[in-house]
Design a protein with these regions (language model features):
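N-terminal ligand-binding lobe of clamshell/alpha-beta domains
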Residues: 1-180
Length: 180
């Protein structure tokens, strides 16, 4: 992504610095999550859009798959082969029963909306992530952090630390963000 931007904006001399930082973060995360057995990897669900009338997620061919795999997790909706986001129903979410939910910045929904069943007629109370209060709103950086962009390395580090805090307890996200 960064290298593509460097072709569009060739006069920017920070491309190599950003690309190197991105690669270093990716390698750091991979090194720390590589030994997690497949059956012990967190199953995460991306709530891409959410309203009173529908919910959308990310299947195997969209950004959520990258984030899940890069952070050492499993995309709970990876069985969906559609490109981009796709409408899903609550029964599918119950069947997937994700251990963590990440709400993107493409929706105004907040974790409290799921904890309290405040939107639509959906009942989230039986979903593991809600039961254990592991629902997170994705941070907003230079742009919406769900999509690839300049914030990608910091977003990956945030995902990894949020999903596996014990493996990344030495990482200070505030300092990493400032340094970046």
């Amino acid at each position: 992504w960064i290298l593509l931007l460097s072709e569009i904006f060739p006069d920017n001399d920070k491309t190599e610095v950003v690309a190197e930082y991105s690669n270093n973060i990716y390698e750091l995360v991979q090194e720390r999550v590589k030994d997690i057995p497949e059956k012990e990897r967190e199953r995460i669900f991306f709530l891409f859009k959410y309203s009173d009338t529908e919910m959308q997620t990310s299947g195997e061919n969209f950004f959520g798959q990258f984030w899940a795999e890069a952070a050492g997790a499993v995309n709970a909706a990876e069985e969906i082969k559609t490109d981009n986001q796709v409408v899903v129903n609550m029964e599918q979410v119950y069947a997937w029963n994700p251990s963590m939910i990440f709400i993107t910045n493409f929706t105004p929904a907040q974790p409290e909306d799921l904890y309290g069943n405040h939107m639509g007629s959906y009942d989230w109370s039986a979903v593991s992530a809600v039961e254990h209060e592991k629902v997170y709103k994705m941070p907003l950086g230079m742009y919406r952090s769900y999509t690839p962009g300049a914030d990608t390395p910091v977003t990956l580090l945030w995902f990894a630390k949020t999903i596996y805090p014990e493996l990344f307890e030495d990482i200070d996200m505030v300092q990493e963000t400032k340094d970046y």
